[in-house]
């Protein structure tokens, strides 16, 4: 199994835009490991690091059990910026990214296509959440 560090390649900020905080699991860990870029997040999401956990999460039928599993087993980011600690008052630098999270939306592909086709809305990164529901 690969490590998060193997999936998160250092990329110059000027080349790939804003950076934001990356946190190791569990969700109650509020201390960031490092700042990463959208490219790093893409490499993490499309890599194998969380593949096993994602498959397990998607096989859990009970929402409460799935939410508890997700909280314990997934690393996470704060797309809004870099933080000293995950707390609104601890923002170091904002990204100016708008993060939209749509869960349990019927015909999600239609909305994906609309966002991607809209010339007024620049999509930097779009992905399906680990639950497969958003």
Predicted regions located by residue number:
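Short, charge-rich binding segments
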Residues: 89-91, 117-118, 127-128
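Short, flexible loop/turn elements at secondary-structure junctions
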Residues: 81-83, 99-106, 130
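Short amphipathic alpha-helix segments
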Residues: 105-123
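Histidine-centered divalent-metal-coordination microenvironment in nucleic-acid enzymes
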Residues: 100, 123-134
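Short, well-ordered loop/turn elements at secondary-structure boundaries
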Residues: 93-95, 119-122, 132-133
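DNA replication initiation on ssDNA origins
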Residues: 1-96
């Amino acid at each position: 199994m690969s490590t998060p560090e193997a999936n998160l390649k250092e990329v110059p900020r000027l080349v790939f835009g804003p950076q934001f905080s990356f946190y190791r699991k569990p969700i109650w860990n509020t201390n960031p490991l490092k700042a990463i870029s959208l490219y790093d997040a893409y490499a993490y999401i499309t890599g194998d690091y969380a593949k096993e956990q994602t498959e397990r999460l998607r096989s859990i039928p009970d929402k409460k059990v799935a939410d508890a599993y997700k909280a314990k087993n997934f690393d996470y980011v704060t797309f809004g910026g870099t933080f000293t600690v995950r707390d609104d008052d601890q923002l170091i630098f904002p990204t100016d990214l708008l993060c939209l999270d749509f869960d349990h939306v019927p015909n999600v592909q239609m909305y994906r296509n609309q966002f991607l086709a809209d010339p007024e809305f620049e999509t930097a990164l779009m992905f399906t959440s680990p639950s497969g529901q958003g």
